[in-house]
Amino acid sequence: SIVLERFKENIKFNKFDKQIKTFQVGVGEKREIKELCLSHVDMGSSSIVNTNLNSDKVKIKILPLSELLKKEEISKVDVLKIDIEGFEDKALFPYFKTLNKKFYPRLILMEDSSQSDWDENILEWLFANGYRILARTRGNILITLEK
């Protein structure tokens, strides 16, 4: 996909190609196939949730985040950056349900401007489970796990 190729170029340009691995899958609550609506205005706004986009659609494979990490033999995530246009609750609730608290990511950077698309408020859950706000930007929030 164009977005993935652009992302890979940025990773290589910034010399992070040894530390960052990309996957051509989406993350969600279960293994399934979903339609991704491609935004012609802003590729980063392509969405599974917002099907009102007057755009082309492609089918993508969705995997639970815990399954993807297990497959890649990643047992602990220290920093999680997630920007999935309103699908954050679908990806994060199932992931946290599989974890012992000692394996929770230390930092999470996530978009919080799509809360109206969430079925459950993942931020409220994260705050109730030990996270606090470290910083906020336009549309994003950086939270840290209190020790």
Regions inferred by a protein language model and the residue ranges of each:
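Phosphate/nucleotide-binding beta-alpha loop and adjacent structural elements of enzyme active sites
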Residues: 1-147
